[in-house]
UniProtKB/Swiss-Prot annotation:
It comes from Oryctolagus cuniculus. PROSITE patterns: INTERLEUKIN_1. Glycans are attached at N109. This is Interleukin-1 receptor antagonist protein. Residues 1-25 form the signal peptide.
């Protein structure tokens, strides 16, 4: 019996996380972490912005366009990365709450992550590209994906049903110039 594609993907992601190479970014090691800024927007053109200390996705136009949050990234491996905002001072994390996963913003400097692999796992996301779009899966809870609601100005969250028609899990992710 062949394992499903989803099972293989989760196994590969887990192995990459557990046995990442020596060329990976190491804050206290051989190679310094390099934070990069990216623009992110979902396939419905909603961008991320901060409202009442919560990351939300909506349509920003005119003078509000300056509210768009850039996503700060520190790569661990080609597919594994830490995500943050506010110049890496607030990091996205996945925290279990009952039987669901919740997306949190934690006041942690993104360049300080990577020193404690087990503790940092909640901040780690697996980036998967499919054509022009990207998905972000939680490394600490495989099967949970970063998502936006179909409606504008709703919190960015996590879903374990990425194909559900009420959420958007595909994003355009472009390095900021």
């Amino acid at each position: 019996m062949r394992p499903s594609r989803s099972t293989r993907r989760h196994l590969i992601s887990l192995l990459l996380f557990l046995f990442h190479s020596e060329t990976a970014c190491r804050p206290s090691g051989k190679r310094p972490c390099r934070m990069q800024a990216f623009r992110i927007w979902d396939v419905n053109q909603k961008t991320f912005y901060l409202r009442n200390n919560q990351l939300v996705a909506g349509y920003l136009q005119g003078p509000n366009a300056k509210l768009e949050e850039r996503i700060d990234v520190v790569p661990l491996e080609p597919q594994l990365l830490f995500l943050g905002i506010q110049r890496g001072k607030l990091c996205l994390s996945c925290v279990k709450s009952g039987d669901k996963m919740k997306l949190h913003l934690e006041a942690v400097n993104i360049t300080d992550l990577g020193k404690n692999k087990e503790q940092d796992k909640r901040f780690t996301f697996i980036r998967s590209n499919s054509g022009p779009t990207t998905t972000f899966e939680s490394a600490s809870c495989p099967g949970w994906f970063l998502c936006t609601a179909l409606e504008a100005d709703q919190p960015v969250s996590l879903t374990n049903t990425p194909d559900d028609s009420i959420v958007v899990t595909k994003f355009y992710f472009q390095e900021d110039q």
